[in-house]
Structure formats: structure tokens, C-alpha cells
Amino acid sequence: MNKQGLFQMEGLVIESLPNAMFRVRLQNGFVILAHISGKIRRNYIRIIVGDRVLCELTPYDLTKGRIVYRQRSTPRP
């Protein structure tokens, strides 16, 4: 875990919303509303529907999260 109290879960982007918000279906089946982190925004990493992402969630609100990593669609050679 990066920060104390946060936990990370892998998910699949199922819908793209305005203002860099996304609906993500987590591994456990829950659907959350997630925004992209500052490092992803600063490095112009594009996230599209169908991408596998890593989300950070806080125990206070399990319906919202932050996308911290987009997994590669093809493995590196």
C-alpha cells in the first residue's frame, strides 16, 4: 500500500465519463466511480474503455476511487 489506510484493487474500465471520470468494475464485482491520478494526468496517459487498471480505494467511501496505474495491453518484448 502506498499510503496508510488505502488499499488497491484491480479492475476493468467499463464506461468513460466527462472530466476524466470512469466507471470501473473491480475484481470482486463492485462498480465504482474513479478519477485519474495526477501523475497519469501529467504524463498524458490515455485510458479507454476495456483497459485494466489499478485503483486506490479508501475505507471511508467504497464507491469512489483513484486510478493509479494502467496495465499494458501487450507484454513488453
Swiss-Prot record:
Organism superkingdom: Eukaryota
Gene3D superfamilies, alphabetized: Nucleic acid-binding proteins
Compartments, as annotated in UniProt: Plastid, Chloroplast
UniProt keyword list: Chloroplast, Initiation factor, Plastid, Protein biosynthesis, RNA-binding, rRNA-binding
Species: Nephroselmis olivacea (Green alga)
Subunit structure: Component of the 30S ribosomal translation pre-initiation complex which assembles on the 30S ribosome in the order IF-2 and IF-3, IF-1 and N-formylmethionyl-tRNA(fMet); mRNA recruitment can occur at any time during PIC assembly.
Purpose: One of the essential components for the initiation of protein synthesis. Stabilizes the binding of IF-2 and IF-3 on the 30S subunit to which N-formylmethionyl-tRNA(fMet) subsequently binds. Helps modulate mRNA selection, yielding the 30S pre-initiation complex (PIC). Upon addition of the 50S ribosomal subunit IF-1, IF-2 and IF-3 are released leaving the mature 70S translation initiation complex.
Alphabetized GO MF terms: ribosome binding; rRNA binding; translation initiation factor activity
CDD domains for this protein: S1_IF1 (cd04451)
UniProt entry tagged with the keyword Plastid: yes
Family matches, as PROSITE patterns: S1_IF1_TYPE (PS50832)
Domain S1-like, residue spans: 1-72
GO cellular component, one term: chloroplast
The protein, known as: Translation initiation factor IF-1, chloroplastic
Cited SUPFAM superfamilies: Nucleic acid-binding proteins
HAMAP family, sorted: IF_1
Signal peptide limits: none
Family stated for the protein in its record: Belongs to the IF-1 family.
